[in-house]
């Protein structure tokens, strides 16, 4: 059968004769028996191009990939820098924030967003003929707190206007706002590197706030493709403030940082209950570009001229969306202008994950919206005494809190100070300060050196150890789960070296899981108190570790590779009874035995 196949396949016969057969090649195939086992002269048949390539070790592949990625990032940075040098980006932001109120702006209906759809609706909310707006004075208080916290001038007299447009989420055919005479003007927000501004913006950026105005929210739409859309009018007339910044932002990262900072300020003064993550805050960005080497643009906004034609990107619902949408629109406008096109004023949309914005409609202006004073609402009069009282009652601003926590009193890093302020509406910060105060009282008998790092140590335990337990258990913050006094006692025992760090974490976990025994009693009952090793016990452990690794000892002595002492410390801690070997004492004994250096007097 093989001979028949070979007769039908002359190429195969030639291959076998030339590669595998011994003896004269002119001989007959019948006189050349086929080998019964693999022979070193048999060649493997390549069936794919990839198999013939030289094998590259995995480590080398990873290095090559990392190098290529690094080069790609460098090229991207260089391209962005070249673009930044050629084109100037200008961004202004409009932030819509739902106020922390129990009633709607112009009716007594509830603002609860958890009730059944269309259950909190007054006649005016649905624009029933003959219904009139009734301004709810309590809705003004959180708006004033926000404006004061954003350094605005509160206007003693402001007025309401009608902004006309027809859309299914606005039953009246107009929105009540404060276009001509807002209640707050001329504010600002300061941004710093820890807020996330772009490195090109330096150490400080101040973004002006043109105005803050009260206005109604619209109904909530819910689409059911292909053709059904449901409306929940519970949200109609929910009190909003619209915060309009000046066009003084020139970097996408700084635009996102500005929105993030404003949200943090609004939350710190209880002006809002939720942020972007739950839909309580939305942002529109106005984007324009112009060439730096050409004459200033012909457009102006908020008193700032020389700008290019702007476009507006609506309803951005996250900080990342703000940054990505600005980048996408900047790139689109640059591409249009470099190809000889013209930027048109229009409203555009952006979808999460997209790299392009899309046109929604032409940009409406003042004439299109037909602004007019609302004849059913009187002027809004705000007294100086009310503003002064609210100003005095505001909590410490976030920037001042960060400065305090990073100062000499607490000594925290900016990275630890920020989450303490931002987490849990200030409850985490209050808990931390309680822990520090109690801990300082417990440590009054200790020397100044021992007490110096108490606040930093407490910050680590509150944020990372206790915070990590909450995250692992997927539980909301609860200051009573581990009372501040209990955590302070655990840290005190650790600081006095009565327990090890591992034991302290074990005790914290026990209390977190519900153990309510006092800390001293718990330590005694569970036999967790540290029994220090004697000097002889340390020497025995060190000699055992040294005897097992003579080559490493010689490297430390001959080449002065002191970093390897840490490895021996780890070996001693593993060999000794859990929690009893102290790293500092182990290091001292090792230096004495290996280097002949002793810290003993």
From Swiss-Prot:
GO terms for molecular function: ATP binding; glutaminyl-tRNA synthase (glutamine-hydrolyzing) activity. GO terms for cellular component: glutamyl-tRNA(Gln) amidotransferase complex; mitochondrion. Allows the formation of correctly charged Gln-tRNA(Gln) through the transamidation of misacylated Glu-tRNA(Gln) in the mitochondria. The reaction takes place in the presence of glutamine and ATP through an activated gamma-phospho-Glu-tRNA(Gln). Pfam families: GatB_N, GatB_Yqey. SMART domains: GatB_Yqey. It comes from Neosartorya fischeri (strain ATCC 1020 / DSM 3700 / CBS 544.65 / FGSC A1164 / JCM 1740 / NRRL 181 / WB 181) (Aspergillus fischerianus). Belongs to the GatB/GatE family. GatB subfamily. HAMAP family: GatB. The keyword Transit peptide applies. The keyword Calcium does not apply. Keywords: ATP-binding, Ligase, Mitochondrion, Nucleotide-binding, Protein biosynthesis, Transit peptide. One of its GO terms (biological process) is mitochondrial translation. It comes from the Eukaryota. It is an enzyme of class 6 (ligase). This is Glutamyl-tRNA(Gln) amidotransferase subunit B, mitochondrial. Its main location: mitochondrion. It is found in: Mitochondrion.
């Amino acid at each position: 059968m093989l001979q028949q196949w070979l007769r039908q396949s002359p190429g195969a016969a030639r291959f076998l004769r030339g590669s595998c057969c011994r003896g004269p090649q002119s001989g007959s195939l019948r006189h050349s028996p086929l080998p019964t086992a693999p022979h070193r002269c048999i060649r493997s048949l390549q069936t794919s191009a990839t198999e013939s390539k030289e094998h590259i070790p995995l480590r080398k592949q990873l290095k090559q990939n990392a190098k290529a990625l690094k080069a790609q990032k460098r090229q991207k940075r260089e391209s962005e820098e070249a673009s930044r040098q050629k084109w100037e980006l200008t961004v202004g932001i409009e932030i819509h924030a739902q106020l922390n109120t129990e009633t709607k702006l112009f009716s007594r209906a509830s603002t609860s967003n958890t009730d059944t759809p269309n259950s909190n609706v007054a006649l005016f909310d649905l624009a029933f003929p003959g219904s009139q707006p009734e301004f709810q004075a309590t809705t003004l208080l959180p708006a004033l707190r926000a404006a004061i916290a954003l350094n605005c001038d509160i206007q003693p007299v402001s007025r309401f206007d009608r902004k006309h447009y027809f859309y299914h989420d606005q039953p009246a055919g107009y929105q009540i706002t404060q276009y001509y005479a807002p209640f707050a003007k001329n504010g600002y927000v300061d941004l710093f590197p820890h807020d996330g501004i772009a490195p090109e913006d330096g150490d400080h950026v101040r973004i002006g706030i043109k105005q803050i105005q009260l206005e109604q929210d619209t109904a909530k739409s819910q689409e059911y493709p292909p053709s059904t859309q449901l409306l929940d009018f519970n949200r109609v007339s929910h009190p909003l403030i619209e915060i309009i910044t000046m066009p003084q932002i020139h970097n996408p990262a700084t635009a996102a940082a500005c929105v993030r900072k404003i949200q943090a300020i609004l939350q710190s003064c209880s002006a809002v209950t939720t942020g972007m993550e739950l839909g309580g805050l939305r942002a529109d960005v106005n984007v324009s570009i112009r060439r730096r080497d050409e004459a200033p643009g012909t457009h102006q906004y908020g008193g700032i001229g020389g700008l290019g034609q702007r476009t507006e990107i609506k309803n951005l619902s996250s900080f990342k969306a703000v940054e990505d949408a600005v980048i996408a629109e900047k790139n689109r406008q640059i591409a249009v202008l470099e190809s000889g096109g013209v930027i048109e004023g229009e409203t555009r949309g952006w979808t999460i994950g997209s790299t392009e914005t899309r046109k929604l409609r032409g940009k409406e202006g003042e004439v299109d919206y037909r602004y007019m004073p609302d004849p059913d609402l009187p002027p809004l009069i705000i007294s100086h005494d009310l503003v002064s009282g609210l100003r005095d009652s505001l909590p410490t601003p976030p920037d001042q809190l960060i400065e305090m926590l990073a100062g000499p009193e607490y000594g925290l890093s900016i990275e630890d100070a920020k989450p303490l302020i931002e987490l849990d509406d200030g409850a985490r910060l209050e808990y931390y300060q309680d822990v520090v105060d109690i801990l300082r009282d417990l440590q009054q008998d200790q020397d100044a050196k021992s007490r110096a790092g108490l606040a930093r140590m407490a910050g680590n335990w509150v944020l990372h150890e206790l915070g990590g337990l909450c995250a692992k258990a997927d539980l909301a913050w609860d200051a009573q789960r581990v009372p501040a006094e209990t955590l302070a006692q655990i840290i005190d025992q650790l600081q006095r070296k009565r327990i090890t760090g591992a034991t302290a974490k074990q005790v914290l976990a026990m209390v977190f899981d519900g153990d309510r025994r006092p800390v001293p009693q718990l330590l005694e009952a569970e036999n967790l108190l540290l029994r220090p090793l004697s000097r002889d016990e340390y020497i025995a452990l060190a000699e055992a570790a040294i005897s097992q690794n003579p080559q490493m000892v010689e490297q430390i002595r001959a080449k002065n590779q002191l970093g390897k002492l840490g490895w021996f410390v780890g070996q001693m801690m593993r060999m000794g009874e859990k929690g009893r070997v102290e790293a500092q004492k182990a290091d001292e004994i090792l230096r004495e035995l290996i280097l002949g250096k002793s810290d003993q007097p």
